[in-house]
A protein has these predicted regions:
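Flexible hinge/capping segments at coil-to-helix
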Residues: 130-148
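Ligand-binding cleft/hinge of the Venus flytrap
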Residues: 51-53, 65-75, 140-143, 155-175, ...
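A ligand-binding cleft/hinge motif common to bilobed small-molecule-binding domains
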Residues: 86, 102-111, 160-163, 190-226, ...
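Short helix-initiation/N-cap motifs at beta->coil->alpha
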Residues: 77-89, 134-137, 171-186
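Periplasmic-binding protein-like
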Residues: 121-125, 207-246, 269-286
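Extracytoplasmic small-molecule ligand-binding "clamshell" domains
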Residues: 26-102, 111, 264
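Alpha-to-beta junction loops
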Residues: 38-39, 74-76, 93-101, 146-148, ...
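Extended ligand-binding regions for polar small-molecule ligands
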Residues: 62-71, 132-133, 140, 155, ...
Length: 286
């Protein structure tokens, strides 16, 4: 479901820049409710969090964040887009108060930021050139051959590939998803590792030049298929804001409106159900 932004929502097309000495400060919930502006960052990644052609924030993260902000009595949101790898540093440098990019909740990230409870859950995918000329169907193929696999800088696919013993020499790092199609169609890499939803979106945008690998097999690490749980992220000093968001998120996830947002952006009923299967405490513990 794509909900329209309310007139009072503000959009910023690029991240604001602070000096090198900037440090994270706790977002004051009372001030936000009293006319303040909630600064929210996304990584311009469909369907998780992105700016559309009208400069409006869309995606499962922004749509749910808008509902939560309204429920908390926060009247203004300023949206910032930045590279995925800059999301956590931006929180730490007080460039924004919250990240709504459905960033996977991982132990190493939990050491750097606070997470809400999961808002979403999603599996993996593989983008390949049209016709899948190298016959690639899983990430393990890249550990057992000389083929190269691309990932986005800062994405958790790096940890997955490392766990599967894919050599660093076969991993190509690109700045963002926008470069993925050209990366696989020009042969710079033989595949692009990303979530299944991202891969599907890229394949649709490629105009037939690339496709999602068919019969893709989810990677298995430590005997378990890999699945990610995404949540909202905050600076370590923003516990009060995180707790307030958690309260409203728990309520909203019980509604049909939340389910419609998930399905509207391509999440399956299983994805929605899986989002309840892990807590942030469990995910942070590893």
């Amino acid at each position: 479901m794509k909900t329209a932004l309310k007139p009072w929502l503000l959009a910023a097309a690029a991240a604001c820049v602070l000096g090198p000495g900037a440090a994270a400060q706790a977002a004051d919930l009372a001030a936000l409710r009293n006319g303040g502006t909630l600064r929210v960052a996304i990584a311009n990644e469909i369907p998780y969090g992105y700016m559309d052609l009208n400069g409006e924030a869309k995606g499962v993260g922004p749509d749910v964040a808008k509902h939560i902000a309204e429920a908390l009595g926060i009247g203004k949101i300023e949206w910032t887009t930045t590279a995925f790898g800059s999301l956590i540093p931006g929180l730490q440098a007080d460039r924004y108060d919250m990240v709504a990019a459905e960033m996977a909740i991982l132990p190493q990230r939990c050491e750097q930021v606070l997470y809400s409870e999961p808002n979403s859950s999603y599996g993996e995918g593989l983008l390949v050139a049209k016709g899948n000329p190298k016959n690639l169907h899983d990430y393990e193929n890249f550990a057992a051959s000389d083929h190269k696999i691309a990932i986005m800088a800062g994405a958790d696919q790096l940890e997955i590939l490392q766990a599967l013993k894919v050599p660093a020499s076969r991993i190509v790092t690109i700045a963002n998803n926008a470069d993925a199609i050209s990366t696989v169609t020009t042969g710079r890499a033989d595949g692009y590792a990303a979530t299944s939803l991202t891969v599907g979106e890229l394949a649709a945008k490629s105009r037939g030049k690339a496709e999602a690998a068919r019969d893709f097999k989810d990677p298995v690490v430590d005997g378990q298929p890999v699945r990610s749980w995404g949540g909202f992220a905050f600076s370590k000093d923003s516990g009060a804001l995180r707790d307030a968001v958690n309260q409203e998120l728990a309520k909203f996830k019980k509604t049909e409106d939340w389910k419609k947002i998930m399905s509207g952006y391509g999440f399956s009923a299983e994805d929605a159900s899986q989002s309840f299967e892990r807590s942030t405490a469990q995910l942070c513990a590893g």
